[in-house]
UniProtKB/Swiss-Prot annotation:
Binding site for ATP: 22-23, 64, 67-69, 130-132, 173, 183, 220
One of the record's GO molecular function terms: ATP binding
Region spans: Head domain (RuvB-H): 257-353
UniProt organism field: Thermomicrobium roseum (strain ATCC 27502 / DSM 5159 / P-2)
UniProt KW keywords: ATP-binding, Cytoplasm, DNA damage, DNA recombination, DNA repair, DNA-binding, Hydrolase, Nucleotide-binding
Superkingdom of source: Bacteria
Record-level GO BP terms: DNA recombination; DNA repair
PANTHER family named in the record: HOLLIDAY JUNCTION BRANCH MIGRATION COMPLEX SUBUNIT RUVB (PTHR42848:SF1), PTHR42848
Gene: ruvB
Record region (Large ATPase domain (RuvB-L)): 1-183
Gene3D superfamilies tied to this protein: 1.10.8.60, P-loop containing nucleotide triphosphate hydrolases (3.40.50.300), Winged helix-like DNA-binding domain superfamily/Winged helix DNA-binding domain (1.10.10.10)
Family note: Belongs to the RuvB family.
Keyword check for Signal: no
Enzyme category, top tier: hydrolase
Protein name: Holliday junction branch migration complex subunit RuvB
Amino acid sequence: MNEPRIVAPQPTTSEQYFEETLRPRRLAEYIGQDRVKESLAIAIRAAQERGEPLDHLLFYGPPGLGKTTLAGIIAAEMGVNLRITSGPAIERPGDLVSILTNLRPGDVLFIDEIHRLNRLVEEILYPAMEDFAVDLVIGKGPAARSVRIALPRFTLVGATTRLALLTSPLRDRFGATYRLDFYDTAALRAIVERAARILQVPITSDGAEEIARRGRGTPRIAIRLLKRVRDYAQVIGDGTITRELARLALDQLAVDELGLDEVDRLILRTLVEKFDGGPVGIQTLAAATSEEPDTIESVYEPYLLQLGFLQRTPRGRIATRRAYEHLGLTYPENRLQLEIPFEHAASERSSDA
């Protein structure tokens, strides 16, 4: 399935500039993630009072929840420059050394997808994070010698959607680690209303709530839906986004009341109709849906798990009673023993590294 999903959490190329215009610049403007925000506010103020750079920070959680935005806010609050790169973009140790040696004192270096750094590059980071220095080997053979280059004190902000893929030596070098969770409807509605004001799109409170309910707990997706609904309001309405118009537009876009699209429903229906609800292994499920296993795990599953529609068990994935009910199907009572109670499953997910 190569068609772009309107509810995909990853940004498209065309969205990257658009997102930049909507990002909050200060912590006070940032909506949601209250615990993270409060902790960061204290850490930033303490660092400012000591006249020191902030500790290295690690953000993890599903894509689209604001990790890049928080890095920008940290730099703005500290009054320093922000340098943005990603794990896949740093191919060689020399690439990272070049970035590090061009930082200024106090600067924030943001590395997205930090779990995708290759091992040689990662090892350069260890002394850079601990000692603010990099060790280079000059020359070859018997004439080779090691030279240590001092770096300015800086703050590394790492972001990952796959915390478990980070090596322990790298993870342990961060001063604080923050988990970003899916947003509730109230926070997402406030984000939609803020974006609508910036875009000068008239929207009612219940119109914003309808978009927020289908935004999958993810600001990036909610704002993307806002843009699409805006088109409907302009063409078939009077320009104002109401609840009725938002429902009409999102129904036509095949985004249901919980934000699921055709791919999500395909995964659930495949589990239910082809494998009797599971358990089924990830490789088999991927083959049956023509998706990559990693794509299912990192893109589709987090939200289905959050809703309690899907569970991971030692034997494989299973569809829950909630999934059957959402699809309008009768749940076989003889499957109850396969399920982990939802509250216990949610607790396991929140503690899952």
